[in-house]
């Protein structure tokens, strides 16, 4: 059982049911679409594609039980732990290549004093928590590209409400075989974030400000991905499209690691006992970071409540309180632009799990959201939302 709540736990939404997590290492993981109109593919293919042909998001076909194994190795370094977690999902990359990708992403990139019980994720090169994933993504994509013998250049299309943009640009800058294009809303990011992006150096980077908000940028990127004829034309010209947003499973999986690392750190410091549940508060915009914690829970990590924190654009907290996801509201520009979002892409992955992985129901709900702006979802048969 996992509970999602808003603010100071004034509401708790319980997601019940048997986890589909019988895998315990060894076999290579396959990935399926949340909308069910595409067959299972390998992790390397899912990383390269970013988004499924049917418009759905890739999810693992099952969740590996790793906590019982990893709790015996609580003294692992972050790099060692990252390998133990990520290999369960991206096993087809191969041990040597995966370890190399992890080492290139994290070795010497982060420095933080351990003084409190916050996961301080802003100590990477761009001061964004997304460095933890976006330093890894280019490395794992390079390995996936080689594994699938892809000769075309890969164009990374990314929409940002602030920190993803700089982190993606930094991660992919001057990486051979890749180009990165970042769309951001003019007047919708902080002055520092805009300056970080437009001054990014690199022979393969492009930054474009749009008239509109983040949701406009994100929906535009999704439309490009959904244009089959356009993508085919690009392929004929030697280019493939992919994404660095958290819709890409290659972005999401490495974020699971720091929840395991944080939990083991609390045990090692004797602040909790092994097996004690912890509650995790996550400021939430596109629902990727909190979803990574949820995935950690499904892998056995002792998590009690996941607390969804929001700003004035509280579409997610309204959803958790009422069950209605109503995006038909005006976007408010706040001092936390990375959370100025009305359409949270990763919620689709939660809806998929909460509806017992019923792809048809998930597609119906997402179509309803896109067409009408409102949807009502049943979460694992527990209650109507």
Q: What is the role of each PLM region?
A:
Residues 6, 14, 19-385:
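PLP-dependent amino-acid enzyme catalytic core
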